[in-house]
Amino acid sequence: MKLFGTDGVRGKAGNFLTAELALRLAMAAGVYFRKNSLTNMILVGKDTRRSGYMIETAIVAGLTSVGFNVRQIGPMPTPAVAFLTEDMRCDAGIMISASHNPYYDNGIKFFDRTGFKLDEKEEAEIEKIYFSDKIINEARKQMMEIGTAKRVDDVIGRYIVHIKNSFPRSETLHNLRVVIDTANGASYKVAPTIFKELGAETIVLANEPNGKNINENCGALFPQNLANEVRRLRADVGFAFDGDADRLVVVDENGEIIHGDILLGILASYLKESGELANDKIVATVMSNKALDDFLAKIGISVIRTNVGDKFVLEKMREIGSNFGGEQSGHVIFGSFAKTGDGIVSALQFSACMIKMHKKSSEISKMIKPYPQILRNLKIKNKKPLDKIKGLDEFEKNIQKDGIRTLFRYSGTENLIRLLLEGKNEKLLNKKMDEAEEFFSKALND
């Protein structure tokens, strides 16, 4: 059985993600982090899911049983856990969250002492320890070697100060009316506080978590309520976060959702203009629209692409010395302020952009026009490796001759292949997509 997926360990709470699994996983992680331990302390945060109590208790039991002292900070955004792990000099950080998933799912993700998510190799080490009864049994402590646990309630202030420092000191939000949707999630206290302290007239939606309403018809995946409220209240802009606040969706004053690639492009150009973009390079994923590349090329910024997943974006940023990157889905990483996607930082930077440019949010969004894209999910019987599909290379080259960008990839969880075509001629795109569906239906349903 494989534990780790693309973003830590995730599954249905009480089914796959049981208290027993969480306890043993915490023990395995404790054994792994023991090798380079400096403070014998691990930070644990969570979002607002009901199952968080069960999983947190199990993790605390697992960590203390192998001798670690634990600091529990309660509901806080994922980027807050990353920041506080380093700021409080902990050996590691653990976030209990399933991000944008429904309340009945939950997850566990790990951060090293510097606040970076573990890479695949490090996760594989923890998984190896998890499945070794010998290592787990030998790691158990007794008597005074057993660790302690302490709930820490005053860390929210540290994170708020840190986030406010990402906003230009010469500016204020006094002239902005902002609507915020916290998805009944981890940012329900932090986000409104930050915007109010910076002077914005702040209206807050979905900030009454009850354990099961996280992401429920609200937040980054359901921004329509936010859009309606922005229009009704004649606000300047709306910001929607997901359950753990590492993702952002922006709504303009007309209630229109701003495309994720437009957000990346505008923020990158703002950093460049401010003299804060490192190496004139940003990182995006293979899903990002080519219009992003073309817009940024005009102002001397290169776009380097990587696989889907904010973890891969950050790895590539570190590799090429960039301090900015993100995904079309709303994960935006400001490397100078955060070690992971941070929706609140991104919202503040967009607000600063509006103020500095003296433009409405809708005017900013019109600076980039994404090329038409068609995405279809095709049900298939088998997932033959793409490089083994006869005739695929030739088929792709024929499509690309017409100026169309192609991306074909399998779903990680279902028997689906995702077909993405992008180009300037929508009629031609539809024709080529029909051809692509026919090609893959024959190739993968034999």
UniProtKB/Swiss-Prot annotation:
The keyword Magnesium applies. InterPro entries: A-D-PHexomutase_a/b/a-I, A-D-PHexomutase_a/b/a-I/II/III, A-D-PHexomutase_a/b/a-II, A-D-PHexomutase_a/b/a-III, A-D-PHexomutase_C, A-D-PHexomutase_C_sf, A-D-PHexomutase_CS, Alpha-D-phosphohexomutase_SF. It catalyses: alpha-D-glucosamine 1-phosphate = D-glucosamine 6-phosphate. Mg(2+) binds at S99, D242, D244, D246. Keywords: Isomerase, Magnesium, Metal-binding, Phosphoprotein. The active site is at S99 (phosphoserine intermediate). The modification Phosphoserine is found at S99. Activated by phosphorylation. It comes from the Bacteria. Its cofactor is Mg(2+). Binds 1 Mg(2+) ion per subunit. One of its GO terms (cellular component) is cytosol. CDD domains: GlmM. GO terms for molecular function: magnesium ion binding; phosphoglucosamine mutase activity; phosphomannomutase activity. GO terms for biological process: carbohydrate metabolic process; peptidoglycan biosynthetic process; UDP-N-acetylglucosamine biosynthetic process. Its EC number is 5.4.2.10. Catalyzes the conversion of glucosamine-6-phosphate to glucosamine-1-phosphate. Belongs to the phosphohexose mutase family. PANTHER family: PHOSPHOGLUCOMUTASE (ALPHA-D-GLUCOSE-1,6-BISPHOSPHATE-DEPENDENT), PHOSPHOHEXOSE MUTASE. This is Phosphoglucosamine mutase. It comes from Campylobacter hominis (strain ATCC BAA-381 / DSM 21671 / CCUG 45161 / LMG 19568 / NCTC 13146 / CH001A). The lineage of its organism: Bacteria, Pseudomonadati, Campylobacterota, Epsilonproteobacteria, Campylobacterales. The gene is glmM.
